[in-house]
Swiss-Prot record:
Record keywords: Metal-binding, NAD, NADP, Oxidation, Oxidoreductase, Potassium
Binding residues for K(+) 2: 245, 456, 459
Enzyme class: oxidoreductase
Annotated NAD(+) binding sites: 150-152, 176-179, 229-232, 253, 285, 386
Organism placement in taxonomy: Bacteria, Pseudomonadati, Pseudomonadota, Betaproteobacteria, Burkholderiales
Named cofactor requirement(s): K(+)
Organism: Paraburkholderia xenovorans (strain LB400)
Protein name as it appears in the record: Betaine aldehyde dehydrogenase
InterPro entries named among the record's database cross-references: Ald_DH/histidinol_DH (IPR016161), Ald_DH_C (IPR016163), Ald_DH_CS_CYS (IPR016160), Ald_DH_CS_GLU (IPR029510), Ald_DH_N (IPR016162), Aldehyde_DH_dom (IPR015590), BADH (IPR011264)
Enzyme nomenclature, EC number: 1.2.1.8
Keyword Nucleotide-binding among record annotations: no
Gene from which this protein is expressed: betB
CDD domains, per database record: ALDH_F9_TMBADH
Amino acid sequence: MAVFAIQRLYIGGAYVDATSGETFDTLDPATGETLASVQQASAADVERAVQSAREGQREWAALTAMQRSRVLRRAVEILRERNDELAALETRDTGKPIAETLAVDIATGADVIEYYAGLATAIEGQQIPLRPTSFVYTRREPLGVCAGIGAWNYPIQIACWKSAPALAAGNAMIFKPSEITPLSALKLAEIYTEAGVPAGVFNVVQGDGRVGAMLAAHPDIEKISFTGGVETGKKVMSLAGASSLKEVTMELGGKSPLLVFDDADLERAADIAMSANFFSSGQVCTNGTRVFVQRGVLERFEALVLERVKRIRVGAPTNAATNFGPLASAAQLQKVLGYIESGKQEGARLMAGGKRLTEGHFGNGQYVEPTVFTGCHDDMRIVREEIFGPVMSILVFDDEDEAIARANRTAYGLAAGVVTGNLARAHRVIHRLEAGICWINTWGESPAEMPVGGYKQSGVGRENGLTTLEHYTRIKSVQVELGPYQPVF
């Protein structure tokens, strides 16, 4: 028997039944328990969501920016009031430790809504003088109906990140969460309605990739914001372009390099490498999974990492002491185990972990040990391909130019980091690394003020920061002539 009642769609400010007749189950990855049966949206349901969003968006856009800002700030207050309740739900659905969801997932989502609520009144046009009798002014107008497609690793945070700038700019959003972690987006929809967002302005349609494809191809949707894998992102982008040339934001995968130089504080470097590989059980798109270490400090760095791996507390996500939970699904577990086996076969030296955990209460969950390979080479699969799990690959380098060249030798370009005691080197190296999100002597923080997104095949566009708001508006240019009109004929 499921823990929660059947999960329906959220359209027009209320729960509604899907018309497809199909459902799918969402499972607790720590126990294998069925959390809920979820209704799959049909094409008719997507159409209903679009029409509802069009109606709601007109009402929402007609409000003043200050009025929209107040509503969004109220949503932030409710999110923070319900932080613990939402964190518990997110932990059950994702398998993340409760200590993590309490501190990060809802809080960082609320921060982004608060940030854009503050910017809603700052959406301004320009006035451009042409001559004494004529000028141009520009207006930034909302796009209309936007769609967001979320990933399974940060369900409510991603829903907040995508909806906040859209709503602040006067748009409506139809959001499709991942079918692996579909629960918390519905709670966000409830909160938006309670805060005063008009019906239809934030709709949630559940389902698999078929639903995402319907959203990407719908001619009345003006923008798609997608978070997920590169290959799926390419398909979404293709559908978006072929249907109506809609604008896209793509936050895709990565195989990010972390460069540790021989002048680094190695204790700090080891701490950074641990966070960059094992936070959220390695299921973070920006993870620094290619750890390049300068030869002279390799042995010491390996010892420090091994010491820290032994301190990881793998356990039930609901236990406050746990800091490493299961992977999000059985499919992801099998994928990660396959990469671990590949690493062994290709000659990497297994320094820690490498096995599925099956004893006791671990047996029903999707647990894999935190895994560290060393002696890795650039052509190994575990070094080339995104694993999206707790697998660190340590590589050795000799000089700065070599490290930069090898770090950039990838189709990805999401994130990169440098650990060094030389500030000049830090900036010099960062400026040559081909990545959209970079850190110096730290890793992983993505505050609301910071634009995040990738180079190369890691994405298109940015989320968060000032510039993102511009991409949820379009510019209308208006010329005004105050003097006589000069006839042409």
